[in-house]
Swiss-Prot record:
Example of a GO cellular component annotation carried by this entry: chromatin
Signal peptide: none
Activity regulation remarks: Inositol tetraphosphate (1D-myo-inositol 1,4,5,6-tetrakisphosphate) may act as an intermolecular glue between HDAC1 and N-Cor repressor complex components.
Annotated catalysed reactions: N(6)-acetyl-L-lysyl-[histone] + H2O = L-lysyl-[histone] + acetate; N(6)-acetyl-L-lysyl-[protein] + H2O = L-lysyl-[protein] + acetate; N(6)-(2E)-butenoyl-L-lysyl-[protein] + H2O = (2E)-2-butenoate + L-lysyl-[protein]; N(6)-[(S)-lactoyl]-L-lysyl-[protein] + H2O = (S)-lactate + L-lysyl-[protein]
Residues annotated with N6-methylated lysine modification: 432
PTM sites of type S-nitrosocysteine: 261, 273
Organism the protein comes from: Homo sapiens
Enzyme Commission identifier(s): 3.5.1.98, 3.5.1.-
Primary gene name: HDAC1
Post-translational events: Sumoylated on Lys-444 and Lys-476; which promotes enzymatic activity. Desumoylated by SENP1. Phosphorylation on Ser-421 and Ser-423 promotes enzymatic activity and interactions with NuRD and SIN3 complexes. Phosphorylated by CDK5.
Annotated TM spans: none
Taxonomic classification: Eukaryota, Metazoa, Chordata, Craniata, Vertebrata
Name of the molecule in the record: Histone deacetylase 1
């Protein structure tokens, strides 16, 4: 598959400022606020000038049940902190309550995360962009009828299902430290989606992703798992990622790629145990981008939130082929980035337990499996189903969904200041022990509340009505003429 260097590609970016207001609760490592921090940082780097920014629609229950079971989505719509006692049996059944708590606005949070990923897939399908970015998406642990690892609705599966309407083969790549179990499970028996996950394996959540898990039925050999040990560094990661992904591209020949960019694989993550720098992590983005395929970039885990914001800002710049300085610009959360106030981070001195021999052995085993694939399986394409977001078809009688607007918003925090710290009594700079790791359910990214100078809207009719009263949310809007 042909690779290109330095080809500038059109990028669109999905963000809703409300996402940063949702709050999982005291001491919970998943902080949607990190999405707002990311957004604010990339705004202050000026990256908004180089891409189209959209506010996603809120995905509805009908969209979510394209994958999830009706009763599970009905439960997510109904459950609230004030009625939990009425749902105790269902909470147990759907694995909601501990790692996946009930919090105010839970379903709306899922709607925003999912809406951005599905809208991104529609944009890619219509060839209206080359790369779509939704840092609030990437919630890869959610199952068909179960929440898991801080994830409730699997926006990735729903986005891939949307891409499959136009693409014969879709490749999913996961560089989060946790195994992408929810996505693998959804497509385990199909040859139209290949899932590739590089993750920590052994005494670690979710406990899946063995080298020998390769898919089943028609999907045999279409699941690729690279189990890793603690402390992998940039050099080792690049040495496995590039050859494995080159072979996958050669054998599978996808026509679209979804890349989950979980940043808990970075050095110093509160729940992680890898030793990647932001540059090392972003090399994966750069390499996948070089294949010049329609690409969806999603968030995922990441629990040291200052580094999450650094990482996803830098990876947005990589998508835009734009170099940004290491000196951080002043931004609303500048104090979080002390004491150095730099974009890039240094690796720690932790031991890399992944020996060259171990990595080579796993790589060769994966190559053997990939050689079992038929070259680019043919797929009988059916009539293309309706797009998930019909209003994007641009009915002339409706308001222009692409009008530019300027949004000033006062972002009020829904928690005390210390809630946004990285350590929270759970060991500043200290890694959790393995028993905690098992319990430490993966954290997936949600959105933020800051709005940007130029933001495009993609909304349903219902939401257009709501938008007529922006003051209800403390948001001032004015149309900005292009």
């Amino acid at each position: 598959m042909a690779q290109t260097q330095g080809t500038r590609r059109k990028v669109c970016y999905y963000y809703d400022g409300d996402v940063g207001n949702y709050y999982y609760g005291q001491g919970h490592p998943m902080k949607p606020h990190r999405i707002r921090m990311t957004h604010n940082l990339l705004l202050n780097y000026g990256l908004y000038r180089k891409m189209e920014i959209y506010r996603p629609h809120k995905a509805n229950a009908e969209e979510m049940t394209k994958y999830h079971s009706d009763d599970y989505i009905k439960f997510l719509r109904s459950i609230r902190p004030d009625n939990m006692s009425e749902y105790s049996k269902q909470m147990q059944r759907f694995n909601v309550g501990e790692d996946c708590p009930v919090f105010d606005g839970l379903f709306e949070f899922c709607q925003l995360s999912t809406g951005g990923s599905v809208a991104s897939a529609v944009k890619l399908n219509k060839q209206q962009t080359d790369i779509a970015v939704n840092w609030a998406g990437g919630l890869h642990h959610a199952k068909k009828s179960e929440a898991s690892g801080f994830c409730y609705v699997n926006d990735i599966v729903l986005a891939i299902l949307e891409l499959l309407k136009y693409h014969q083969r879709v490749l999913y790549i996961d560089i989060d430290i946790h195994h992408g179990d929810g996505v693998e499970e959804a497509f385990y028996t199909t040859d139209r989606v290949m899932t590739v996950s590089f993750h920590k394996y052994g005494e670690y959540f979710p406990g899946t992703g063995d080298l020998r898990d390769i898919g089943a039925g028609k999907g045999k050999y279409y699941a690729v798992n690279y189990p890793l040990r603690d402390g992998i560094d940039d050099e080792s990661y690049e040495a496995i990622f590039k050859p494995v992904m080159s072979k996958v591209m050669e054998m599978f020949q996808p026509s679209a790629v979804v890349l989950q960019c979980g940043s808990d694989s970075l050095s110093g993550d509160r729940l992680g145990c890898f030793n990647l720098t932001i540059k090392g992590h972003a090399k994966c983005v750069e390499f996948v981008k070089s294949f010049n395929l329609p690409m969806l970039m999603l968030g995922g885990g990441g629990y040291t939130i200052r580094n999450v914001a650094r990482c996803w800002t830098y990876e947005t710049a990589v998508a835009l082929d734009t170099e940004i300085p290491n000196e951080l610009p002043y931004n609303d959360y500048f104090e979080y980035f002390g004491p150095d106030f730099k974009l890039h981070i240094s690796p720690s001195n932790m031991t890399n337990q992944n020996t060259n021999e171990y990595l080579e052995k796993i790589k060769q085993r994966l190559f053997e499996n990939l050689r079992m694939l038929p070259h680019a399986p043919g797929v009988q394409m059916q009539a293309i189903p309706e797009d998930a977001i019909p209003e994007e078809s641009g009915d002339e009688d409706e308001d222009d969904p692409d009008k530019r607007i300027s949004i000033c918003s006062s972002d009020k925090r829904i928690a005390c200041e210390e809630e946004f710290s990285d350590s929270e009594e759970e060991g500043e700079g200290g890694r959790k022990n393995s028993s905690n790791f098992k319990k430490a359910k993966r954290v997936k990214t949600e959105d933020e509340k800051e709005k940007d100078p130029e933001e495009k809207k993609e909304v349903t009719e219902e939401e257009k009505t709501k938008e007529e009263k922006p003051e209800a949310k403390g948001v001032k809007e004015e149309v900005k003429l292009a």
